[in-house]
From Swiss-Prot:
Residues 734-766 form a coiled coil. InterPro entries: Nucleotide-bd_a/b_plait_sf, R3HC1/R3HCL. Residues 1-16, 65-112 have a biased composition (Basic and acidic residues). Residues 235-247 have a biased composition (Polar residues). This is Coiled-coil domain-containing protein R3HCC1L. Keywords: Coiled coil, Phosphoprotein. The modification Phosphoserine is found at residue 671. Transmembrane segments: none annotated. The lineage of its organism: Eukaryota, Metazoa, Chordata, Craniata, Vertebrata. The modification Phosphothreonine is found at residue 695. Gene3D superfamilies: 3.30.70.330. May interact with the exon junction complex (EJC) composed at least of CASC3, EIF4A3, MAGOH and RBM8A. Residues 1-127, 235-262, 755-775 are annotated as: Disordered. The gene is R3hcc1l.
Length: 775
């Protein structure tokens, strides 16, 4: 019976060939899946129960029934165990998406890998798999969860501070062999992948985000953005490390060999990580003291190539003196370090600009030197000194960015405020002044020598011309008339004035005579245009050459500005034009005001009296409604019957009443003749008058009801004799009317016929003009 039932059983639908696994290979597939779940252990560690469960069905069929039942029970346990493992592996596969293969940081397996970590991992996983072994596994696993993922995103780059949880597995320094990392390859963060191949230590991470997190001495990796800009990547750890790296703006990083102290492999769930630019920040307790290794000759050359693209064509020579940090001047971002202020010395060609020194403070952050293409430079010669960039000169400058865009160095002199100490100026007095005329310290000396005498003569004219043209100048340029005294007392003369004016300051400040001539040309109505943002904003070109003369020059600027503005303010002040009572004192204004005032009366009187406005009366001629009269001045208690009783004599010929209000009504007659006849009669209770003399309301009522003002014709006299005769003949009943009544109806009908015949004959006689007496 069982064979027949099995023969009649419906066969299940076979799956596709691509997914179909033959019966002979099913046991092998289960073995392979279980082996993969157990961390790729040696084949000697396959449990005995599992081997027995994987025997072919033919062997189990040859056993006795009792053994088969026992084997089936054990097989059921094995199947349950495999299903549990399969569900666990499925959960782990769900947590790691399809990008698991791309995001792993693969490394070679070594013979000297950590034994304690692997044994701990094996002990954690052994109860699940049911395997007991004494040989450690050859694979490290990432922690399953993380405590905190802090993401701080600013612009295109961000800081991810990753701290593994206490439950996450960490490999100590004693467990990991001391070997240097080699052939580190870093991929683009924008592609959500981060591959580090060819590592000698075995580190396997299965996170979704780039998770190559390792700390080792003398190595700081550099992550590459999509545009090729280098980002310093540092790693966090609890142990001391002393990383040092060679970072260049073109994205290259050189690592010095060292030993691995700590390898931390953080990981986390996939839902906690985003595909953003990742920058791991290091908090190292060690120190890095290197100047040549931090930024070598190759880094300098690459920086020079980057800065050459700037319109100023400056070559950058970076000298970094740091004690606890690593600085990359090409990266525009902030790095936390305790190092002192680093100085970026910028050397320029003598034919273009002066020497600029860019001070970079690492506590405040990096400043990108290459971003000054469309911005003008403000140069301040400060009192600090740095290592000489060119022979025979020593200067220190700060490159700032002005608010206005200027890519041309010919406008460079309009935005310069120079101040220098006596010590740099004394050092600048050297035999190489003529050779290094492009430096700003020599610029101040030679410029002071050349224009000391000419500037004194021209400043007086400049103040006079500015005072005359103050009303027409949108931007006031003031100069100090006593500047020559400060220049002569503190500065020495030199012989290279003309060359300095052409090379350093350009053609905008060749001579002060051009400024004087330009201001004099304003009087002759020639154009002198300057760019401005506001009329209240003024550009002051002041030149001071020592710390002691800074206060003096500021005071002189203030006095000159007040003097220039005072000349125009006296003329336009309210006190000079009006007295305390508010009367005008200026005769010119009095003449102007008195001449423009008109004494003629210009008020236009209204043509209409809007207060006594009345609507025009409705003009109704007598011929428009001649058959209508107005009935007025009667008591309010009167009704229609009372008025009809008064005009009862005209009711037979046709008469009707139309009410206007309680005391006014319209009387409509059959003809104008009857209406004129009614106007001739006098009544004691009412008064009558024609419609042309009626009130405005009565006229409006008459015009509104014009089509209803015709008198209604009387209904002709009829009898029911014909109707009664038709009903009797149709129903076949006898009439109940008496003989006398019937004769009276016949008589009325005959009279009506006769009257109708006479009216028709009279109408005809009227048209024919016949005499009606005959009738």
């Amino acid at each position: 019976m069982q064979q027949e039932a099995e023969r009649c059983r419906v066969r299940t639908k076979r799956p596709d060939m691509a997914l179909y696994v033959p019966k002979a290979r099913r046991g092998t597939a289960l073995l392979k899946s279980s082996d993969q779940e157990e961390g790729h252990g040696p084949p000697a560690f396959v449990p005995k129960d599992q081997k027995e469960g994987c025997l072919p069905q033919k062997i189990s069929a040859s056993k006795p029934e009792s053994q088969r039942r026992g084997a089936g029970h054990s097989d059921r346990k094995d199947v349950d165990c495999r299903e549990g493992k399969r569900s666990a592996s499925q959960l782990r596969k769900d947590r790691c998406p399809q990008k698991q293969n791309k995001e792993k940081a693969c490394s070679k397996k070594g013979a000297e890998e950590s034994t304690e970590a692997s044994s701990q991992e094996h002990q954690h996983r052994a109860p699940d798999a049911g395997i007991v072994s004494s040989i450690p596994l050859q694979r490290l696993f990432k922690p399953k969860d993380m405590d905190c993922w802090e993401v701080q995103t600013a612009g295109a780059t961000g800081h991810w501070r990753v701290s593994p949880s206490q439950s996450s597995s960490e490999v100590s320094a004693a467990q990991v062999p001391s070997r240097p990392f080699q052939n580190v390859e870093l991929c683009d963060f924008s592609g959500e992948t981060f591959v580090n191949r060819n590592l000698e230590s075995s580190i396997v991470t299965e996170a979704k985000v780039p998770e190559l997190v390792s700390q080792f001495p003398q190595v700081v990796t550099t992550l590459l953005k999509p545009d090729g800009m280098a980002m310093p990547v540092t790693l966090s750890s609890d142990s001391e490390t002393a990383p040092s790296s060679l970072e260049t703006p073109d994205g290259m990083s050189k690592h010095s060999p060292g030993d691995i102290s700590v390898v931390s492999v953080p990981g986390g769930p996939d839902e906690d990580v985003d595909s953003t630019f990742v920058d791991f920040e290091v908090e190292s307790e060690g120190t890095v003291n290197s100047t040549e290794s931090v930024l070598g000759q190759k880094g300098v050359d690459s920086i020079l190539e980057t800065v050459d693209n700037v319109s100023l064509k400056m070559a950058v020579v970076s000298k970094l003196e740091s004690t606890n940090g690593t600085i990359d001047p090409a990266v525009t971002r902030e790095c936390e370090s305790d190092s002192s202020a680093d100085e970026l010395c910028v050397k320029s060609e003598p034919s273009d600009t002066a020497v600029l020194v860019h001070e970079i403070d690492t506590d405040d952050g990096f400043r990108n030197v290459c971003d000054s293409t469309s911005k003008a430079c403000m140069v301040d010669i400060a009192g600090t000194a740095c290592d000489p960039v060119t022979e025979g000169s020593s200067c220190t400058g700060a490159v700032g960015e002005s608010g206005e865009s200027s890519g041309n160095m010919r406008n460079f002199s309009d935005y310069i405020e120079m101040s220098a100490d006596v010590a740099p100026l004394d050092r600048a007095k050297s035999e190489n002044d003529s050779e290094n005329i492009s430096s700003l310290s020599a610029c101040s000396d030679i410029y002071a020598e050349s224009i000391a005498s000419g500037f004194t003569e021209s400043t007086g004219k400049l103040i006079e011309s500015v005072s005359d043209g103050a009303s027409s100048l949108p931007i006031k340029k003031t100069a100090d008339s006593n500047i020559a005294t400060c220049l002569d007392s503190e500065l020495s003369m030199s012989d290279a004035s003309d060359v300095l004016l052409e090379s350093a300051l350009g053609s905008d400040l060749d001579t002060t005579e051009e400024m004087t001539e330009a201001l004099h040309d304003l009087k002759t109505a020639e154009e002198f245009k300057t760019k401005e943002e506001d009329y209240s904003e003024s550009v002051v070109c002041g030149i001071s050459f020592s710390d002691s003369s800074v206060e003096t020059s500021v005071d002189l600027k203030t006095t000159d500005t007040s003097h220039i503005q005072g000349s125009s303010a006296v003329e336009e002040s309210w006190e000079s034009m009006f007295n305390d009572d508010g009367d005008c004192v200026d005769p010119r204004l009095l003449l102007e005001l008195s001449g423009n005032v008109k004494n003629r009366k210009s008020i236009q009187e209204p043509r209409f009296d809007y207060y006594s406005h009345e609507l025009p009366d409705i003009d109704l001629s007598e011929c428009e409604f001649p058959h209508v009269i107005e009935i007025y001045d009667f008591p309010q208690e009167f009704r229609t019957e009372d008025l009809l009783r008064i005009f009862c004599s005209y009711q037979k010929k046709g008469f009707d009443i139309k009410w206007v209000d309680d005391t006014h009504a319209l009387g409509v007659f059959a003809s104008p003749i009857t209406a004129r006849d009614a106007l001739g009669t006098k009544h004691t209770m009412v008064k009558i008058r024609p419609l042309s003399q009626a009130t405005r309301a009565a006229k409006a009522k008459a015009r509104a009801c014009a089509e209803f003002l015709q008198p209604a014709k009387e209904r002709p006299e009829t009898s029911a004799a014909l109707a009664r005769r038709l009903v009797i003949s149709a129903l076949g009943v006898r009439s109940k009317q008496s003989k006398t009544e019937r004769e009276a109806e016949l008589r009325k009908l005959q009279e009506a016929r006769e009257r109708k015949r006479l009216e028709a004959k009279q109408r005809e006689d009227i048209w024919e003009g016949r005499d009606q007496s005959v009738v």
